[in-house]
């Protein structure tokens, strides 16, 4: 929903704008003035301060940022500010839906023992940060992959708490202007690569490679630290969703994404993880400090929901090997629980146990009546995740999986282009799937041709497809050294399970809200008809643009594919966002990807790049 429509002349618009701004500032002062925390958390970018953005390349943006913020662009009857205010520097790492200050201000009554304070709590539109998030002092363009796996700029994530706290575990080490990652972890001080090989050896996988000749492709690492486990699995063609909350281990997911490793901010609390059932072949917890016995095994049952038939759970923790009374008691209770869940010990050696989930429903059906935990209700949807609470029950397999005694997935990489078994759940045919795959391959080739003057082989690493559908955009990038976070809306067909069945990863998300990631974490955003979609929901295009700017790294790219009228509206914000046009191309309405266009309106591919800028305060601090 675009803001600021104008019905009168320029003079009237200016007077009206000034009055509205004055009233709004007064409202903010009265509303937040009583709370020092609220005032410091919002400040609306220090009210309406000027950007003061000096480009590190020496470009002053043609002096446009020196103009008064209240000057409006009246073209096509839309009044749009030529510059957005900049949020206070202290908010350079704000995550709107995971903002502890917002929780305090709203006095939300959350159960800390259930980790509710680490779950999503999104501000209403009137309390959003409608300002640009500044990079921290001394920010530099991130180090390119694959070098970034082992080192990042310290200025980009100025948090050295973990380096000191975990100094004996080789998580990360300060080295001058950089932070290096030796590959260690709490349980694998001598390197994740050796630890991974040892697990593969325990499971008798060929050549001590955990991918089991392509049969093991998707992994969930809970309590992942700085994601070194997932980083070293990439060499084996294993895609890991590294998951952790933004807790006392400051910014661990931010470090992971800065390194170019797939990661997501999330927690095993009260809500289901944002993944469909049967998404992962392997789950991992290395001293993740999770009480798996709480609430009748609720958290372990959530892992069970997202594991595929025959999937593994590797658990490296004192409970698995320590001989003191407390740990022996926990081990006994945990062993009894997983036995009732029909898991079996695949192997137990040294400090690690690996359990395996059954291949079919046979064991569930053979349990004694009244055995806990029970099977979930037959009418329960195991794939519904948006705002759905976890349940302490076992998710049985579908008739297809029970009959085939497994997921029926092809090994990787054939899995990427093979028709997923769950395709029939949506009434899609194999022909539709193959055509979609080929169409997006052509489109991605076209995108890269349009960006050829700007994009080299290592320019982008972290990519997000904001409307992934069946994941064919990501599939088309298989030969590039990138990874894709595939996002599927909770309002449409839940095709995220098809994406996981292709050996890709993703999450469920509504773009009327902020995404669960730190600022400056993605190199490229692909927005296919996202703006048209949110407009139909009555949500703000301006809010989405500001959110995309928050997510996007400086020098990163946005590919917008939408109606021409929508793209023309977006163009009015480029100067305010400090984005510049890279390429623009009309799309034929006969394209099967763009058939929703009304009245024969052409769709447009519009590609922009975010400039690198710092606030004047940050520049002074870095001198």
From Swiss-Prot:
One of its GO terms (biological process) is methylation. Keywords: Glycoprotein, Golgi apparatus, Membrane, Methyltransferase, Signal-anchor, Transferase, Transmembrane, Transmembrane helix. It is a single-pass type II membrane protein. Pfam families: Methyltransf_29. Residues 1-13 are cytoplasmic. InterPro entries: Put_SAM_MeTrfase, SAM-dependent_MTases_sf. The keyword Glycoprotein applies. SUPFAM superfamilies: S-adenosyl-L-methionine-dependent methyltransferases. Glycans are attached at residues 204, 350, 588. It is an enzyme of class 2 (transferase). Residues 35-623 are lumenal. It is found in: Golgi apparatus membrane. One of its GO terms (molecular function) is methyltransferase activity. The chain crosses the membrane at residues 14-34. GO terms for cellular component: endosome; Golgi apparatus; Golgi membrane; Golgi trans cisterna; plant-type vacuole; trans-Golgi network. It comes from the Eukaryota. Its EC number is 2.1.1.-. Belongs to the methyltransferase superfamily. This is Probable methyltransferase PMT8. It comes from Arabidopsis thaliana. The lineage of its organism: Eukaryota, Viridiplantae, Streptophyta, Embryophyta, Tracheophyta.
């Amino acid at each position: 929903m675009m803001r600021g429509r104008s019905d009168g002349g320029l003079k009237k618009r200016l007077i009206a704008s000034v009055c509205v701004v004055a009233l709004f500032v007064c409202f903010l002062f009265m509303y937040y003035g009583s709370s020092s925390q609220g005032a410091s958390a919002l400040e609306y970018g220090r009210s309406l301060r000027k950007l003061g953005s000096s480009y590190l390349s020496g470009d002053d943006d043609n002096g446009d940022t020196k103009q008064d913020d209240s000057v409006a662009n009246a073209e096509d009857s839309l009044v749009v500010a030529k510059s957005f205010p900049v949020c206070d520097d202290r908010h350079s790492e704000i995550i709107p839906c995971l903002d502890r200050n917002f929780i305090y201000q709203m006095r939300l009554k959350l159960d800390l023992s259930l980790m509710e304070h680490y779950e999503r709590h999104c501000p209403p539109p009137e309390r959003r940060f409608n300002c640009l998030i500044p990079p921290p002092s001394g920010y530099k363009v991130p180090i390119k992959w694959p070098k970034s796996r082992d080192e990042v700029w310290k200025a980009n994530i100025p948090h050295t708490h973990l380096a000191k706290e975990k100094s004996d575990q080789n998580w990360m080490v300060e080295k001058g202007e950089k932070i290096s990652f030796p590959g260690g972890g709490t349980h694998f001080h001598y390197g994740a690569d050796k630890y991974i090989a040892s697990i593969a050896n325990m499971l008798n996988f060929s050549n001590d490679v955990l991918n089991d000749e392509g049969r093991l492709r998707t992994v969930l690492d809970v309590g992942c630290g700085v994601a070194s486990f997932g980083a070293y699995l990439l060499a084996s063609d294993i895609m890991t969703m590294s998951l952790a909350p933004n807790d006392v281990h400051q910014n661990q997911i931010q470090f992971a994404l800065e390194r170019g490793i797939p990661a997501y901010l999330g927690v095993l609390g009260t809500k289901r993880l944002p993944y469909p059932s049967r998404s992962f072949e392997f789950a991992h917890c290395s001293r993740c400090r999770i009480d798996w016995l709480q609430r009748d095994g609720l958290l372990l049952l959530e892992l069970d929901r997202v594991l595929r038939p025959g999937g593994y759970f590797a658990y490296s923790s004192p409970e698995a090997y320590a001989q003191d009374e407390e740990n022996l008691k926990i081990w006994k209770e945990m062993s009894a629980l997983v036995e009732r869940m029909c898991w079996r010990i695949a192997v137990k050696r040294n400090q690690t146990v690996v359990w395996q989930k059954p291949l079919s429903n046979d064991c569930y059906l053979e349990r004694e009546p009244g055995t806990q935990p029970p099977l979930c209700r037959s009418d329960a949807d195991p794939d519904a995740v948006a705002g759905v609470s976890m349940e302490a029950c076992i998710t049985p397999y579908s008739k297809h999986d029970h009959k085939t005694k497994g997921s029926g997935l092809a090994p990787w990489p054939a899995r990427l282009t093979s028709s997923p078994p769950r395709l029939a759940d949506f009434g899609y045919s194999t022909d539709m799937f193959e055509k979609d795959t080929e169409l997006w391959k052509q489109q991605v080739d076209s995108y890269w041709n349009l960006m050829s003057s700007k994009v080299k082989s290592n320019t982008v690493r972290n990519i997000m497809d904001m409307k992934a559908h069946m994941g064919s955009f990501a599939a088309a990038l298989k030969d590039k050294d990138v990874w894709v976070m595939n996002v599927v809306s909770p309002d449409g067909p839940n095709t995220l399970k098809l994406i996981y069945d292709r050996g890709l990863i993703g999450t469920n998300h509504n773009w009327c809200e902020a995404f669960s990631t730190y600022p400056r974490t993605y190199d490229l955003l692909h927005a296919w008809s996202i703006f048209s979609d949110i407009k139909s929901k009555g949500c703000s295009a301006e809010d989405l643009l500001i959110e995309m700017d928050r997510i996007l790294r400086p020098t990163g790219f946005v590919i917008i594919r939408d109606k021409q009228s929508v793209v023309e509206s977006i163009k009015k914000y480029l100067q305010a966002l400090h984005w510049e046009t890279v390429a623009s191309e009309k799309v034929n309405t006969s394209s099967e990807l763009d058939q929703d266009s009304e009245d024969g309106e052409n769709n447009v591919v519009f590609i922009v790049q975010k400039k690198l800028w710092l606030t004047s305060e940050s520049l002074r601090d870095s001198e």
